[in-house]
Regions:
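Generic hydrophobic, helix-prone segments enriched in Leu/Val/Ile
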Residues: 30-34, 97-104, 129, 136-139
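Terminal targeting/leader modules
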Residues: 34-35, 116, 123
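Short glycine-rich, low-complexity/disordered patches
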Residues: 39-52, 108-114, 141-144
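Short, positively charged and aromatic/hydrophobic N-terminal segments
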Residues: 6-11, 17-18
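N-terminal ordered "arm"
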Residues: 19-79
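Solvent-exposed, charged helical/coil patches
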Residues: 119-144
Length: 144
């Protein structure tokens, strides 16, 4: 049974790889890959909080987790739940350059040390998620 399952997985992987290699839509191939590896889960029914695990590794070889909070006014707050600043404080490496990087990506550092960006109705939530992820990765990579 295990051998059959293994062959199925290998065949599916080879099939997917061949399709992408023969296809000229590289953007679609990349986005499909990201979609396969991105996991979204609900963390709280009360506040409509969703955790999105992105397929990008931090310096601890963990996937980046961000949280999307659906607000009552229809906006969404995208946050790192304090991970970035906490990591810098644990390593005693928080610098002014990190604060400048946060501002560069239109991210807000909150009083609880979480980083966040708000996407209002009609806004581009993909842009907001992408900017927060880039900010987290940029700061994390500076402190390897």
């Amino acid at each position: 049974m295990i051998h059959i399952l293994y062959n199925f997985i290998v065949n599916q992987t080879e099939k997917r790889y061949k399709i992408y290699m023969n296809d000229n839509d590289f953007k679609k191939a990349y986005l499909d890959y990201l979609n396969e590896l991105t996991i979204q889960t609900i963390t709280s029914n009360k506040k409509s909080i969703y955790r999105i695990s992105l397929p990008y590794l931090d310096s601890y070889n963990d996937y980046l987790d961000i949280y999307v909070i659906k607000n009552e006014d229809g906006s969404c707050t995208i946050t790192d739940d304090g991970w970035t600043i906490r990591m810098l404080q644990d390593n005693k490496t928080l610098t002014e350059k990190d604060i400048a990087t946060i501002k560069l990506y239109d991210i807000i550092k909150n009083e609880d040390n979480s980083l966040s960006i708000t996407c209002y109705p009609g806004g581009n939530i993909g842009y907001c998620i992408h900017n927060l992820a880039l900010c987290m990765l940029k700061i994390d990579s500076r402190h390897l």
